[in-house]
Amino acid sequence: FNGYQPVGILITDDVIASGIPFSIIGMALIIVVWGFFEGFNYAVICEKINSRYPSKKKWLDYGAITCAIICILFHPFSTSFWGIVEIITTFIAIYGMLMARRQTGNAWGCVFAFCFIWNAI
């Protein structure tokens, strides 16, 4: 399989080549583990930054802005037109995900977003 792999880590090619039942189980395991830890880590990092630098404005969240910038810098991107669109989309997705966590007080939405939505972007 060549091309874009949303959950493309070092073992993804081996998992895909392992046959139908094992590839489905392996990809599900990768998505759940990756989604849980990345979503949960952004929620924790955002909370720590907000406890240190609280904002009085409802829609300004320093932790969410920082996490969105970190997410953009940690993941590969390009400076083409579609690369810029992807950067803007990523910023909106991460900022929105963390603002929803702030409004609801529930970090499980961050895990859900990374398990199901983020891997499709």
Which stretches of residues belong to each language-model region?
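Transmembrane helix-loop-helix hairpins at the membrane interface
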Residues: 23-121
